[in-house]
Design a protein with these regions (language model features):
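Conserved PLP-enzyme active-site core in the AAT-like
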Residues: 145-314, 379, 394, 403-409, ...
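PLP-dependent enzyme catalytic core of the Aspartate aminotransferase-like
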Residues: 18-24, 125, 426-477
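N-terminal entrance/gating region of PLP-dependent enzymes' catalytic architecture
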Residues: 14, 36-122
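Gly-rich Lys/Arg/Thr-decorated short loops/hinges at beta-loop-alpha junctions or inter-strand turns
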Residues: 1-2, 98-110, 126-133, 158-159, ...
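Short loop-beta-helix segment that forms the pyridoxal 5′-phosphate
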Residues: 108-112, 116, 128-148
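Active-site C-terminal subdomain of aminotransferase-like
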Residues: 272-378, 382-385
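Charged, compositionally biased N-terminal leader segments and the immediate start
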Residues: 1-23
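Conserved C-terminal alpha-helix-loop-beta "cap" of PLP-dependent enzymes
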Residues: 354-454
């Protein structure tokens, strides 16, 4: 491998001369002789690839490909549904890119890395502060898996075998939880959300002694703010647990779920210091009441004193199957989201409580401003009348098709939202019962000028005769 003939090819595993020498020592003339006993129709075929490029040529090709992208930063984006475009201060990537944090894996002697453990401890503290809960873990993979793990945690705590999910829960959370439940032979019931929020009488009819937990999103997928306290009272009256999914930014303004009766709170860290990045990576968070700490999945960092009386951080509970017997483990949740959790911590620390409140207020005020502007357009109305945070649904006139309208907006530089009646992916629809409805999200990144432009362009698009003719064709097909 260190032949004088390949000194300028240090990354090649073997040069042509070295391969020839090895074949000669083996006693065959060519590589094909080594695999001659393998039928030709099952052998790997030679890939039809072009000649290799120099670094300069490759850089040019990749730049040309990247130029074809249409990132949200070059458009007016009103997409939401779980991933939100928010401003990330430069200090966030600066800190998480430090070599002390940006490592390949957790140290196998974690107490050596006191800085990393302190960061995890501070992350847990921040999560407890915004959720109003007693204890939080070191992070989860993302929001959907945190939701599923919370459901499994509730099953272990109650010994019951049924989960109720309200209709306002994000479809991705619901599908991941359903996957977990089906594998574990746990029943899963879906509550409708015909008016955008959970119906109390429908919930009461679903509750019985077999229900382990009820999962509610706050604000929910449609942006509506659920009445958590009333729902929690009903859930607890039947001996079940209340699992709440929350966008952390909304908690800068809304009452903490823990103060409204939540037993377990989960969510996604994407909106706090993490970029959209084509949908990932992100991190999930999970917090619960102190009584449930032994069933909390993942890792927990704690603070104690060492044998010299100095403050020290340590991993206090690690009920993962990597650390204890599988039969006693709470989950197999890994550690690879720690860097994204750190980004959330840095983001929240930079904002502080007042900054988070101001950020949430701006998002809410601008969302309400846009909703009012859009509803002034003939034929456009809010789909639900429920109070909302920074996300809301509108219903377009029956004479047009939502997918066509959104495509027209995109052609004009506006990502107008999510078509709630469209097939989100091969596994199911976002909300097929909501015909011609669009889900719109607003953050601090959407200026008032952008909001005015959205309303202006949507009005133009809806008044277009060409659009209406196209919509008729779409509806006829």
């Amino acid at each position: 491998m260190n032949s004088e003939n390949n000194w300028n090819f240090p990354y090649l595993p073997a040069t042509a001369a070295e391969r020839e020498a090895m074949l000669k020592d083996i006693g065959v003339r060519a590589f094909d002789d080594l695999v001659s006993h393998i039928p030709g129709d099952v052998r790997l075929k030679t890939l039809d690839m072009q000649e290799g490029l120099s670094e300069m040529e490759l850089s040019s090709v990749l730049s040309d490909l990247a130029a074809k992208n249409k990132p949200a930063s070059r458009q007016s984006s009103f997409l939401g549904g779980g991933s939100y475009r928010r401003f990330v201060p430069a200090v966030v990537p600066s800190i998480i890119s430090r070599s002390e944090f940006s490592t390949a894996y957790t140290p196998y002697q974690p107490e050596v890395s006191q800085g990393s453990l302190q960061a995890i401890y501070e992350f847990q503290t921040a999560i407890c502060l915004i959720t109003g809960m007693d204890v939080a873990n070191a992070s989860m993979y993302d929001g959907p898996t945190a939701c599923a793990e919370a459901a499994m945690m509730a099953v272990r705590l109650t010994g019951r075998k049924k989960i109720v999910i309200t209709g306002g829960v994000n479809p991705e959370h619901r599908m991941v939880t359903e996957t977990y439940a089906n594998t574990c032979k746990i029943g899963l019931n879906m509550l409708p959300a015909d008016k955008g929020v959970t119906c109390h009488s429908d919930l009461k009819n679903q509750l019985d002694t077999d229900v382990a937990c009820v999962i509610v999103q706050y604000p929910n997928f449609f942006g509506a703010v659920e009445e958590l306290d009333k729902l929690a009272a009903e859930v607890h009256a039947h001996g079940a647990l209340m699992v709440v999914i929350s966008d952390p930014v909304s908690l800068g303004l809304l009452a903490a779920p823990g103060d409204l009766g939540a037993d377990i709170v989960v969510g996604d860290a994407q909106s706090c210091g993490n970029f959209l990045s084509f949908g990932g990576p992100s991190a999930g968070y999970m917090a619960c009441r102190k009584d449930f700490i032994r069933q909390l999945p993942g890792r927990l960092a704690g603070m104690t004193t060492d044998n010299r009386g100095q403050k020290a951080f340590t991993l206090t509970l690690q009920t993962r199957e990597q650390h204890i017997r599988r039969a006693h483990a709470t989950s197999n949740i890994c550690t690879n989201q720690a860097l994204n959790a750190l980004a959330m911590l840095v983001y929240l620390t930079c904002l502080g409580p007042q900054g988070l409140k101001e950020l949430a207020t701006i998002s809410m005020q601008r969302a309400h401003y846009l909703a009012e502007k859009l509803c002034q357009i003939d034929g456009v109305k809010r789909t639900f009348d429920s109070p909302f945070f920074n996300e809301f649904a509108i219903t377009l006139p029956a004479s047009v098709d939502a997918a066509v309208v959104l495509n027209e907006l995109k052609e004009r530089g506006i990502l107008g939202g999510i078509d709630l009646s469209a097939n989100a992916d091969n596994s199911g629809c976002h909300a097929p019962q909501l015909k011609n409805a669009v889900l719109i999200a607003v953050t601090e990144m959407n200026s008032v000028a952008e909001l005015d432009k959205y309303a202006e362009v949507l009005s133009e698009v809806l008044s277009s005769k060409t659009l209406k003719n196209t919509a008729k064709k779409v509806l006829t097909v």
